[in-house]
């Protein structure tokens, strides 16, 4: 079974209670409409809470900026058997999706923007609550299997994500991929490490980003939100919008912000790991720039699909 594709719908919204009320009310409706398509295998929706300062490289940043930032970034992951399933779902349910998303327009500062990625590396255990832990270990014991203690990756806002942006020098993609995978394998030993994956951008969804050419642009501005623009006015296909240089997201999950800060800090402080990560740095046009996310709303069954490989 192939690894799922990931569409990440990004938007910048006002940081105020109304935004979070909309996130809680509109988000579930969007997920239910999305679930109509059989190619949909799960979701993981985040808000950004801060930025990793990386020592003093980004000295104005903090691990938690939720109280002082005027905007909040929302990053909504959806997982698909094939990226074409994502596009088909949008077209089949466009009236519902447009009206739901447009209902949040009053809070919008930037977006939506929806790149699509293939997963080229994944070490993502299933999510478990503390109540599941004894059942998992007990089942292994009863079956006579080795008692490798699984990590407890708690869902629904109880962990954090390092969302690391990278742009790679053309021709150095393989060097980057090899070095970043070795880096992540070494990070496994850090306290609080809960899993990681490397996402390679394959393009951008025009319909998911509401990019409809001139005609659709004016339709969006001129209508009250009850009349959706024609989705066939999208001017490009997903692969045509692939960025150059190549874009990657390195998604690393941690038990809490302290684990994230000291864990990611190993690429600066642990000599052997630093040497490997330096090979990553030598391939970059841009990055690493690490946003800190909190997964607030999840359909964790995508992990079950991923781990069936």
From Swiss-Prot:
Main location as per UniProt: cytoplasm
Cofactor(s) needed: Fe cation
Induction details: Aerobically induced.
An example Gene Ontology CC term for this record: cytoplasm
EC number: 1.13.11.55
Catalytic activity line of the entry: 4 sulfur + O2 + 4 H2O = 2 hydrogen sulfide + 2 sulfite + 6 H(+)
A GO MF label: metal ion binding
UniProt activity-regulation remark: Inhibited by zinc.
Post-translational modification Cysteine persulfide, affected residues: 31
Subunit structure of this chain's protein: Homoicosatetramer. The resulting structure is a hollow sphere where catalysis takes place in the inside cavity.
Name the UniProt record assigns to this protein: Sulfur oxygenase/reductase
Organism: Acidianus ambivalens
Gene this chain is encoded by: sor
